[in-house]
């Protein structure tokens, strides 16, 4: 897959194009230019390190939405075995913006649930761009209650711009579905591990993100509203999105300082989409450790900690 570069990555894109051209020349001729290719590769890596070491919140928001980032089904394929997808909410329909089912994690049976976006236009429309309707959240809750019934740990992956705000979704009880998930997740009698892998958009993310451990990938975001949405409300223009992103505190390191996130999972150089394999290794190492810890904690303590976590959200201070 040809890499897609964001606007602030254009200097990296130019170097990558030069490297590709030199590789083509080397393949088509007897000239040895491997030293020059190696020099440009090092220059590209150094430039990438420099750019990504000082990303603004607005740029991190762009990375979190990168079209080539790994999605929930990519994590399921890499981290789990024997995945059996389960469908439908048993009330209205099957929402393809939420995927989930039974799987094995290191041989242990678990329930995995997550948002799913699409890669191409047809799939994006089918998945509703990762924005669940009420039936998606009710499907997620049905799966998590099934996990509770059989004593299976729950692992969730969060990546959504937010819950779908359409008329039909509101008519079918979007806010009720989200609220019910929050209520039920606080008392689900099995370990719950949550990982934000891309966008963590408001209640649409929180509805599957109440857990014993909440993780974020290094360049993911988590916020009550998108920077563009916030800017449109406060300044009546989306052009102020960068200012909104700065004020909202949407980044993983900022949220960890506020004790809203347990672990910030390091991403490969250039973001998770640049090296799926390394990303999966990093995520798996964290989930293995947390699952072991969660299963060693008495259930009453686990539930108490989880409830205290959600009740601590929304702290403020007066200057």
UniProtKB/Swiss-Prot annotation:
PROSITE patterns: COA_CT_CTER. One of its GO terms (biological process) is malonyl-CoA biosynthetic process. Pathway: Lipid metabolism; malonyl-CoA biosynthesis; malonyl-CoA from acetyl-CoA: step 1/1. It is found in: Cytoplasm. Its EC number is 2.1.3.15. SUPFAM superfamilies: ClpP/crotonase (SSF52096). Its main location: cytoplasm. It is an enzyme of class 2 (transferase). Signal peptide: none annotated. Keywords: ATP-binding, Cytoplasm, Fatty acid biosynthesis, Fatty acid metabolism, Lipid biosynthesis, Lipid metabolism, Nucleotide-binding, Transferase. Belongs to the AccA family. This is Acetyl-coenzyme A carboxylase carboxyl transferase subunit alpha. The gene is accA.
């Amino acid at each position: 897959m040809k890499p897609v570069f964001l606007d602030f990555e254009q200097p990296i894109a130019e170097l990558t194009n030069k490297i590709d051209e030199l590789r083509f020349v080397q393949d088509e001729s007897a000239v040895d230019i491997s030293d020059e290719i190696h020099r440009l590769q090092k220059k590209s890596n150094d430039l990438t390190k420099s750019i990504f070491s000082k990303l603004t919140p607005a740029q991190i928001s762009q990375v979190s939405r990168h079209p080539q980032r790994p999605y929930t089904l990519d994590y399921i394929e890499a981290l789990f075995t024997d995945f059996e997808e389960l469908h439908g909410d048993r009330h209205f329909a099957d929402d393809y913006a939420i995927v989930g089912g039974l799987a094995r994690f290191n041989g242990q049976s678990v329930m995995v649930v997550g948002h799913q976006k699409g890669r191409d236009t047809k799939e994006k429309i089918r998945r509703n761009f990762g924005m669940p309707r009420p039936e998606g959240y009710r499907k997620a809750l049905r799966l998590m209650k099934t996990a509770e019934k059989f004593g299976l740990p729950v692992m969730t992956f969060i990546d959504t711009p937010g819950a779908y705000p359409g008329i039909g979704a509101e008519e079918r009880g979007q806010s009720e579905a989200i609220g019910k998930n929050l209520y039920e997740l606080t008392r689900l009698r099995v370990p719950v591990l949550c990982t934000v892998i891309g966008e963590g958009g408001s209640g649409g993310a929180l509805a599957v993100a109440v857990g014993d451990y909440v993780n974020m990938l290094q360049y993911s975001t988590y916020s009550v509203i998108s920077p563009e949405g916030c800017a449109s409300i406060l300044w009546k223009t989306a052009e102020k999105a960068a200012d909104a992103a700065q004020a909202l505190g949407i980044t993983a390191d900022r949220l960890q300082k506020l004790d809203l996130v347990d672990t910030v999972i390091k991403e490969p150089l250039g973001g998770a989409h640049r090296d799926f394999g390394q990303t999966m290794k990093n995520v798996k190492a964290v989930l293995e450790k947390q699952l072991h810890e969660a299963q060693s904690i008495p259930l009453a303590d686990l539930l108490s900690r989880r409830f205290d976590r959600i009740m601590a959200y929304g702290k403020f201070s007066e200057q």
